[in-house]
Amino acid sequence: MTTTTQGEFAAPVDDYVCPTSVAEAARLLAEVPGARPLAGGTDLMVQMRLGHRRVERVVDVTRIQQLRGIDHEDGSIGAGVRMRELLADPLVADRYTALVEAARLLGGRQIQAMATLGGNLCNASPAAETATPLLVHDTVAVIEGSQGQREVAVDELWTGPGSTVLAPDELLVRLRPGAVEGRSAYRRIELRRSVDIAVVSAAARLHVVAGEVRVARVAIGAAAPTPRRVPDAEAALVGVGVHDLDPAIERAAVLASAAAEPIDDTRAGAGYRRAMVATLAARALRGCLEGTAKG
């Protein structure tokens, strides 16, 4: 039996392998039903240690170079890039403001040093911090497995809580944000700042040309089975002049709330979540106009 070296997230495993290529990882995942990839381990290792998830084989993907790096030419981000790397990269800060703010709010420094972008997305939590920022930047997910490579829009990556479109032998390889125009912002509410996951979150992007909104994006998290964009809210903003945006933002916020499918749980009630969707959507949209994404 091997114990993974993930600090306080360590857990004993019977079958631990460490491939150096996506092709090798795909083969190792396909060989054993119940195999799971390991990147940062901040979710998987905790679930295993607590007995909440049984994993027949752990496939450590941290040595796969194809999953690393931020490409300053095409703006793509490797699925294995850690939150700390996102926070330190000037291209990400300049182009994807909402993503930087989400990464900054994802746990404390130890979590940020370990948690990866791909892991945060593939855990498929409705509250995944980086999901809504990637949604508002029209991101494409690059997936690779034994059958080759394919691309899906990031809003098609999740099929439900804890579930994705990835086949058992596939890895999320890179994220390719498709839009950098305008400003983006991220807002959330949590129980304990930088410790707990979001109770509700929202991200937005506005591209203003000649005093008029040309492109609008609004996405909500922890308010439905999966993170989602709100096309009705976006449509309420397009074509509106910046001096007339206040009522349009309020209308968009109401539409975002209407699109939510919140649940009651130990952290918050459905009614509270629905109300906060409107509040956070409005804050995120106004954050775009401020040119910053304050938490």
Language-model features: locations:
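C-terminal structural segment of proteins
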Residues: M1-G295
